[in-house]
Amino acid sequence: MLALLSGSALGLVPSTHWRRFTDLHAGEWRGRWSTLGPDGTLLDEISAAQRLEVAANEDVATNTLIFVSQSVRSDCETCFDSEETKEMPAGSFSADTLPYYICGQGSALGPRVLRSGAMSFEACVRHGDERVRLTAQFAPEPSADGSGAPVSLALGRVTFACEALAPAAAALVPAARDVPLDWDGTWAGGRHTLVAPPSPAAEAVVTAVTGASLALEGAAEATLLALPSRGVSAVLPARILAAQPALLTLSWQPTAGTTLRLEASVEALGRSVVSTESSTVMSPPRLLELTVSELRRE
């Protein structure tokens, strides 16, 4: 039996960190959630929303997922579309248990261990009233003889959520955008970095960037996934090897001349905390470094 300890560097979170988090995520975000397999095959696409409500005068936030169960499109100019939705509570947290890392106009949740034993990592970048979230899962792979601790984590399902703040969602509709990927030229702007090993409340270091090239290619052991019509792409490790840093990259072009890029270095399967003949308990995965670049074409 394998168990991965689920842990994160929490503790008291300064009010400034809480404000940065709510400024970035509060509200109801509607859009299209596209789920791809590790080979890039589109597995599912749905209309959904995420609502983060922050209690007045309290450092408490409640998270709710909203799924469209049925929709009816009007066939006349003076009529309205209608839809039925289902809501699913997705937990709550307070300022002193905030697990999000905030870095410029981006954030990261995880890496963390799910009940299934898989590792999950969520990355998000925001531009105006729009954002893109990426959630990637990695499943443990056993050793060659099937005994002992796993030697790697294999990339599984990946979900891109292209969303806009309600009520602006009707006007923005990220899923209908046509912003093909275009990395040509050089780029300049700012880069926010949380140095290793960051705590959720850490302050990002800001540096200027000029003459940067944004060519995005998958490495030999990496997978390039993209939604070209929405200007979204990601380079993810096909496998995360035990105790070796792995780089996850999310890029988004909300306009032809604007790019947001989030790069996260993570580590998993670090060391065996407890190991017996029947079970192995591994140290939790951790975020080593987080960088968010906000760039414009020169």
Locate each region found by the language model:
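N-terminal chloroplast transit peptides
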Residues: M1-L12
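Soluble ligand-binding/transfer domains with enclosed cavities or grooves
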Residues: P14-E298
